[in-house]
Design a protein with these regions (language model features):
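Active-site helical microenvironments for divalent-metal-assisted chemistry
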Residues: 1-219
Length: 219
């Protein structure tokens, strides 16, 4: 492993020690960081981007970590990526979420890649281990918000956006399966099948034929 990346990993593991994800599984927070870094690497991210993936929540969630400290330890370039990914915790949560939408188009390519990986990991967690007590509406609102943020990013590798959308589909389907009615779950399945067919380039007539066959139990 590259020295920069291994140092960033060690630093993040120490700073995030004792933190857990919000999902029912209560996984150590470092599981999220591992996945984000792995996705950035898989999508051909630079060494700086992979290091930033490990560090992206340290300033926000691990006081007294600062951008100045990250610059000293890991370089200005890495610290700048982390700065692009750090919310202002002094702002209300609703404002921070709105700022993520507004600021997404301004992200550098490296920050865009880490943000995409971060949202992909979070959506996967919503699909498989959602936070305790989240209603159907809250899950769907999060999925829609994450889609808006990602849709505004200026750099989206094809493999990355494909994985993100696949997890969004699964998160929506699981939400309806867990908390919706049978009819809602069926309708969600149809919407997801239609979206996937469109992403694969199927024509309107092909999609119509497929959906009719599905509804008639021909598949």
């Amino acid at each position: 492993m590259n020295d920069l990346i291994s140092r960033a990993e060690r630093f993040a593991r120490v700073r995030h020690e004792g933190q857990f994800r919000k999902g029912k599984a209560q996984e150590p927070y470092t599981i999220h960081l591992e996945e984000v870094a792995a996705l950035v690497e898989r999508w051909s991210g630079s060494e700086r981007a992979i290091a930033a993936a490990w560090l992206h929540d340290t300033v926000e969630d691990c006081p007294p970590t600062s951008l100045a400290e990250l610059e000293t330890l890991f370089s200005k370039e890495v610290a700048d990526i982390v700065a692009e990914l750090t919310d202002d915790k002094a702002q209300p949560k609703a404002s921070r979420k709105e700022q993520q939408i507004i600021n997404a188009p301004k992200k550098s390519n490296e920050a865009s890649l880490v943000k995409l990986a971060d949202k992909t990991s979070n959506i996967g967690a919503i699909a498989n281990s959602p936070p305790h007590g989240w209603s159907l509406e809250r899950r769907l609102e999060y999925i829609a918000w994450a889609n808006t943020v990602v849709g505004n990013l200026p750099f989206l590798p094809a493999e990355g956006i494909s994985e993100f959308l696949r997890r969004c589909d699964q998160a929506e389907l699981n939400a309806y399966d867990d908390l919706g009615t049978v009819r809602q779950a069926q309708n969600a399945s149809l919407r997801i099948l239609e979206r996937r067919a469109k992403r694969l380039g199927s024509s309107e007539s092909q999609i119509r034929k497929f959906m009719l066959g599905f509804l008639e139990g021909a598949l």
